[in-house]
Amino acid sequence: MSVVLSLKNIKKNYGPVKALDDISFDVPKGSVFGILGPNGSGKTTLLGIVMNILKANAGNFYWNGVQGSSSEMRKQIGTLLETPNFYHYLSAEKNLKIAAAIKGRSYEEIPIVLEKVNLLQRKDSKFSTYSLGMKQRLAIASTLLGNPDILVFDEPTNGLDPAGIAEIRELMKDLNRQGKTIIMASHILDEVEKVCTHVAIIQKGVLKTVGTVQEVLNASPTDKAATLEIEVSAENITGLEEILKQLPGIISVTNTGSYLTIESAETLSSSSINKYCFEKGIVLSQLTLKKKSLEKRFLEITGGKSDR
């Protein structure tokens, strides 16, 4: 898979404070790449560096294999790093005409981008009449002028109500299906898990882990091997617990009273567990493969509290 953005040993200091400490990772083309971390972890600083708003103290970054961010390259990137300054008394269409003029884009693109964000029917409505979600969709429409291949968003759902959050998340998935590579910073675990294909977790300027969302979810707390979480139950739950502790590949067994939660190596399938128990004379009444949440994995990695 080709890479649209490659970061190599990025460092950024603010006096004695290390905002970013030796950050390196690649963003695959066609991905929705989430940069996840608590507030103050360095996410916005990192986006500012790759967009040439801030200068790193050390390290390099490459857009499509070219070092730095030239003006020509930036034309291929739609960026929303802060709330755009739309005029409340003007319509959506007129606001986008101003944005198009500033960017040197054709007015003919305006109905196209409004259609993409599902605002074409409200193009003549004043910005002041828009809901929070609609305002953010208009901001994203502005980033789509010029039909960029890459979109960069900083906390795209920040401050929105639940309806607005759902609108923006679905829009990002739609844009990705249309071939856009999306890079987004977020402190919201649920958002990254539902929207992103890849994630880099940053804490206090340090890259803790990076990979596909599924790889990060499946990795063990020690990052030595991928693990599965399975719930099992049987009439003889005490006997079940005893035999499972003897099965190679079982990492831990927790008895909740009504069922057992086991953590196992990914190589140990649920069918092999079922067969093993049957051969030991225990028939399972429940065997459920549980999906590990990104919140749980985040806490394992950072040892801290999550921002939901």
Label every PLM stretch briefly.
Residues 170-264:
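ABC transporter nucleotide-binding domain
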Residues 67-68, 104, 207, 234-235, ...:
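Short, surface-exposed acidic/glycine-rich loop or hinge patches that mediate macromolecular interfaces
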Residues 5, 12-184, 189-203, 207-209:
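ABC transporter nucleotide-binding domains
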Residues 1-11, 304-308:
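ABC-family P-loop ATPase nucleotide-binding domain
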Residues 64, 101-104, 217-222, 249, ...:
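A generic structural signal for secondary-structure junctions
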Residues 264-308:
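C-terminal coupling/interaction segments
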